[in-house]
């Protein structure tokens, strides 16, 4: 308590307190507009706050206005008014202290007495007078006053006006401490921005840290970004800031997942020369990794490596799994080695990520090495790690190691899951280890897992592929009994197996079950039919085709044609005709190749009954070539045109771009047939028209006076004989009528036709000498030979060869049924030249 004897002024740094004390002798205070609760029994006491002297603190809630309105006080009490020492009150008399002031405690005892504490002028001095001594103005008092003003005026011009009127000159320590006390962010920012305008302002990292913390608590990230820009400007202009605030801003933004803003601040901090700490790097990398941008995180990590920042354990734990999962295994393993060299203990997640990633990348040795090291560090493998290792080794085909890990997993107390069972079974089945696969399959069923259709299918297909019919059927029945629907591939594998084993009845049963399951069975049934056709099992193919027809299953024209050709090749003409009729009625195209192949069978046929069947089949084709054949053997009265004209009209109707090979094949077979039938003139007409249409463009070559040649290597026997006779006749006319005699004439026959042609020419004493593949003679000798009457008769009339020998050679040497082979490939020789 204070007892004022003649006091004019209450010092500013003295706090008024109200206490209910009967010892106090001070007059009572009536209610006022400042504190209406001040009434009767409250005594007016003044004491120094012990917080100032003991804790250097201040309570901002208690202060006295400059002109308090003390209602109900005596004149003496009303003279207790705050005044500055320089004030003039109506006279020239100074308003200083006139008498001593006694300081009392609550019991009324005198604590101290002396001259009153003189107030100071704003901005003129930073001390107070205690008697005649100067005493520094306490920081706690300054901070308390600043806080009082800020909390009252909050923000705006009025706040700045009040702060400008402070009786003391603040410094950055006062501002920093005030910011720590003021909890309202807007008020704190107003105080800070006022301080920035003052001449005594210096950038303070601590101030920014306090402000950023307040903005972060209020989730005002826009304000953080704005204040960060101010801080960057302060740093560039003064350069006195430390880097705590930079790092704190980036950490706040990273934890709030403000990716773009955080990275922008990170770049600006780097440009400002800020030293980024490890925690900031960690937070940024975690942000980018969580956002699915691992490569950006690695970019930050690389920039971290370039600085003096050291990786700590948390950074290793963060970056190694990310590098491993992104495929940068060498970098991840290098950091793993560094981590161990720095005596840091890797966590289980580091080991797990390396084991998993190395295994999936096929680096199984490294994966197993890390796995063994992990056990050396005392970590126990998890079920997930076992699954990853087993999966990696199984996919790599190292099934022995996979089984060892499988047993180790079960010994560790882990129960293999459904997927692991499936993987082990399928990997062993696909590698051909069906016994191991079936053993694990039975264990899977005992463990209570129902195998998936894919597991059943894998086992079924592998057993089917290995030809184990009984095991495949057992798995199929087990699958259907379990209520599972076999897949299309399973049905195809099983049907293929049954077809190869020639189990037609069982295959038909499976096909009907497949149809009942809702699958389209036409293609599968056709595939089975094709297997029988390729296997030359014509009887089984016909049986399967009848089953398909009775079950309403259709096949395509291509397979019908293949089966028809197989029947023709095996002499089953009775079965072939219905197939041909089916092909024709289903709008299937009977082309020139197919017709020619039937004609080829007719050429080789020596049985009259079969000839009738073949003629019936030729008629059933309804091909235009058959009408041509019929017209070719009729007389000119019925044709109403010469043979040559008739043949030319037929060949003009052929599309040579699409059917050139077929037309060449038809010429070869037709000439064989005509020669056998003794129709030499008709055969020569066919050859002439074929040569005119350039079906054999390189057959005849006139090399002026040097050499004339005929190449018959690509012709059938009949075509070669006709070509030789017709061409020699042309050579004779050219030499006798025009007098052009070449040096030599060659007949290029090849090894196959050489003997036949040589035998034919030897009957008329030809001058041609026989070599390996060519018959050649000088032009003058051939000229003399052409002058003989027998040669003229030979070239104009018919071929004097024995029909039985020619027929026998045609049966043996006739080309195969393939279109190009029929027309291009030379037939094989019947016997050697020595035999002839």
Swiss-Prot record:
It comes from the Eukaryota. The keyword Zinc-finger does not apply. It is found in: Mitochondrion. GO terms for cellular component: mitochondrion. InterPro entries: Pentatricopeptide_rpt, PROP1-like_PPR_dom, Smr_dom, TPR-like_helical_dom_sf. Pfam families: PPR_3, PPR_long. Keywords: Mitochondrion, Repeat, Transit peptide. NCBIfam families: PPR. This is Pentatricopeptide repeat-containing protein At1g79490, mitochondrial.
């Amino acid at each position: 308590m204070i007892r004022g004897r003649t006091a004019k002024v209450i010092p500013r740094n003295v706090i008024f307190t109200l206490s209910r004390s009967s010892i106090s002798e001070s007059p009572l205070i009536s209610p006022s507009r400042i504190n209406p609760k001040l009434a009767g029994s409250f005594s007016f006491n003044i004491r120094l706050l012990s917080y100032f002297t003991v804790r250097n603190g201040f309570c901002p809630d208690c202060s006295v206005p400059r002109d308090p309105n003390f209602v109900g006080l005596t004149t003496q009490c009303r003279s207790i008014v705050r005044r500055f020492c320089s004030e003039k009150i109506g006279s020239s008399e100074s308003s200083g202290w006139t008498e001593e002031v006694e300081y009392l405690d609550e019991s009324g005892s005198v604590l101290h007495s002396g001259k009153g504490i003189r107030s100071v002028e704003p901005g003129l001095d930073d001390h107070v007078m205690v008697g005649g001594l100067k005493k520094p103005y306490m920081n706690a008092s300054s901070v308390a006053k600043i806080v009082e003003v800020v909390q009252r005026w909050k923000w705006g011009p009025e706040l700045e006006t009040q702060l400008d009127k402070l009786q003391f000159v603040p410094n950055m320590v006062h501002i920093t401490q005030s910011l720590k006390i003021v909890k309202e962010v807007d008020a704190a920012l107003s105080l800070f921005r006022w301080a920035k305008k003052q001449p005594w302002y210096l950038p303070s990292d601590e101030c920014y840290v306090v402000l950023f913390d307040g903005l972060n608590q209020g989730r005002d990230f826009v304000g953080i970004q704005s204040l960060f820009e101010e801080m960057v400007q302060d740093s560039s202009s003064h350069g006195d800031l430390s880097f705590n605030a930079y790092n704190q801003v980036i950490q706040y933004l990273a934890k709030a997942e403000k990716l773009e803003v955080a990275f922008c601040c990170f770049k600006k901090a780097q440009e400002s020369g800020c030293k980024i700490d490890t925690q900031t790097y960690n937070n940024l990398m975690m942000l980018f990794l969580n956002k699915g941008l691992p490569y950006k995180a690695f970019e930050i990590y690389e920039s971290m490596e370039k600085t003096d920042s050291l990786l700590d354990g948390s950074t290793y734990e963060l970056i190694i799994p990310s590098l491993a999962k992104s495929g940068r295994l060498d970098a991840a393993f290098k950091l793993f080695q560094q981590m161990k060299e720095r005596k840091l203990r890797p966590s289980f997640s580091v080991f797990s990520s390396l084991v998993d990633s190395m295994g999936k990348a096929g680096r199984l040795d490294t994966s197993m090495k890390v796995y063994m090291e992990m056990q050396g560090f005392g970590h126990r493998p998890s079920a997930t790690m076992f699954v990853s290792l087993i999966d990696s080794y199984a996919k790599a085909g190292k099934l022995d190691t996979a089984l060892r890990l499988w047993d180790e997993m079960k010994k560790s107390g882990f129960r293999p899951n459904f997927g692991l069972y499936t993987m082990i079974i399928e990997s062993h089945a696909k590698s051909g280890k069906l016994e191991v696969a079936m053993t694990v399959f039975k264990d899977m069923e005992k463990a209570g897992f129902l195998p998936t259709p894919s597991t059943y299918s894998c086992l079924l297909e592998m057993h089917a592929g290995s030809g184990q019919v009984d095991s495949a059927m057992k798995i199929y029945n087990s699958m259907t009994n379990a209520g599972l629907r076999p897949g299309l591939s399973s049905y195809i594998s099983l049907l293929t197996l049954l077809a190869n084993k020639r189990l037609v009845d069982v295959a038909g049963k499976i096909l009907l079950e497949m149809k009942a399951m809702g699958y389209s069975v036409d293609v599968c049934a056709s595939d089975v039919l094709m297997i029988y056709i390729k296997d030359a099992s014509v009887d089984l193919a016909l049986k399967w085709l009848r089953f398909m027809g009775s079950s309403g299953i259709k096949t395509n024209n291509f397979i019908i044609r293949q089966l028809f050709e197989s029947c023709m090749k095996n002499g089953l003409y009775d079965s072939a005709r219905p197939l041909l009729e089916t092909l024709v009625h289903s709008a299937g195209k009977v082309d020139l190749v197919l017709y020619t192949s039937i004609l080829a069978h007719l050429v080789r046929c020596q049985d009259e009954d079969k000839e009738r069947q073949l003629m019936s089949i030729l008629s059933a084709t309804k091909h235009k070539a058959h009408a041509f054949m019929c017209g070719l053997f009729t007389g000119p009265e019925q044709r109403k045109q010469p043979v040559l004209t008739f043949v030319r009209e037929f060949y003009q109707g052929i599309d040579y771009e699409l059917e050139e090979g077929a037309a060449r094949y038809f010429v070869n077979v037709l000439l064989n047939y005509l020669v056998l039938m003794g129709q030499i003139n008709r055969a020569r007409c066919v050859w002439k028209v074929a040569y005119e249409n350039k079906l054999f463009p390189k057959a005849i070559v006139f090399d002026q006076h040097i050499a004339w040649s005929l190449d018959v290597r690509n012709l059938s026997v009949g075509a070669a004989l006709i070509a030789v006779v017709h061409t020699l006749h042309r050579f004779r006319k050219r030499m006798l009528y025009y007098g052009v005699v070449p040096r030599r004439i060659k007949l290029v026959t090849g090894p196959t036709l050489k003997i036949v042609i040589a035998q034919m020419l030897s009957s008329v004493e030809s001058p041609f000498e026989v070599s390996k593949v060519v018959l050649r003679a000088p032009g003058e000798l051939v000229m003399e030979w052409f002058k003989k009457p027998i040669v003229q008769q030979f070239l104009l009339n018919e071929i004097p060869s024995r029909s039985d020998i020619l027929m026998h050679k045609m049966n043996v040497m006739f080309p195969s049924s393939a279109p190009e082979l029929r027309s291009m490939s030379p037939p094989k020789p019947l016997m050697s030249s020595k035999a002839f």
